[in-house]
């Protein structure tokens, strides 16, 4: 009787194991250095990795929260010269931290499906050419601070909900942040760039905040939804353009200057615009659009003209 019970338990254990029940599959990331190209690929589980450079100049890919790298807790590349880095995380709720990395050319990162996070460490990274970050479906969180990027910086949340915060970036050309039909949040703080930057969040109730920004030009387009746009201490050599689309939107400018033109278009809905110490070298144009719109003038000057139209309330 005991023998039969033992055989039955053994058979059940084998069947459960074969079905994947009672056994744990390790989160696996592969890291391969092909000449001067570092390629990191995840699986469809929740992976957490840190990509960092130590004091000797070695590049380490370290697994966290049970993630294995090449089957081990971490992998070390001895003093590599990285021309390009490609990171493909695929599905799962992934977490990527990049600390003190130097890439001579491009860094491309696709977070894949899932609720993903990309963060920078205490030591800023340097990208010689372009930084491209892509999300997919899910909640995509991007937090980068202090990086130097020689070319363009592009963050595209794809179909997910984008929560992007870029702080103290020095970008050679442009910053581009793109959301989709979700409640996106984009924050740029203390960024300097040489190109014309743009933020596009499309539908849903979005929030865009730009503070201490110096660049060639800036375009913000939030499209439909109850959107909020705030620009504070923003200076550009070229145009500043904001379009919030239909529904009830709020736009506030404080200490905003363009050496060319400023255009704000609020479109349909009961919108409001407030400006304090706002100036354009040439034209400053503000369009309220359909609805009962509010215009608060705390010092707005267009060198050639100041054109305020389709606003109904002037408190």
Task: List the model feature ranges, each with a label.
Residues 9-19:
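Bacterial N-terminal signal peptides
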Residues 24-315:
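Acidic, glycine-rich low-complexity segments
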Residues 1-11:
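Bacterial N-terminal signal peptides that target proteins for export
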